[in-house]
Amino acid sequence: IYTAQLTDWSEVGGEPGPIQPFQRNPDSGSQTLFMKLLMRGKQPMTPPTELVQQTMGGLIDGVAAFDGSGSALGYSVYYYASLMYGNPNLKLLAVDGVAPSNESIGNQSYPLTNDFYLVIRADEPADSPVRALRDWLLTDEGKRLLEEENYVWARAGMPQQSAGAGNPFESSSLPG
């Protein structure tokens, strides 16, 4: 769709009608994720100016309100689209039959996820603020706060810690 090879909803199992693919501006974080997770090295088509949105909220509202026909398509970060901003006229689509949810993102059955890591130097002093924050985030209280904020622990919910020989960093996989 975003390479303009498919331009009509009937080509993807929908009712006949043109697909209106909204995009973000090239410098946005969601556009960067779109390029990484969906385009995978392919170049997207140049969209009409009115389909390029400067904010995630603008994209969500633009897709939800576009001419009332349901012909618009867009992308956003799950957390933002469903929990922070939201729009009752927006429908989140399944990918390969898997709908986005905290559960499907956490168990990685939803294919479009992005991991976040907290990385600190292995030689970071034990009393440093960054080590204190990392250690606190890995406590039950820290995990509970992250879950309350709707971050999702990946890989069966367990943070990963590693520091190998010659590796000057310690890392902890945080929910993404």
Spans of model-derived segments:
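Flexible loop/hinge segments at secondary-structure junctions
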Residues: 1-176
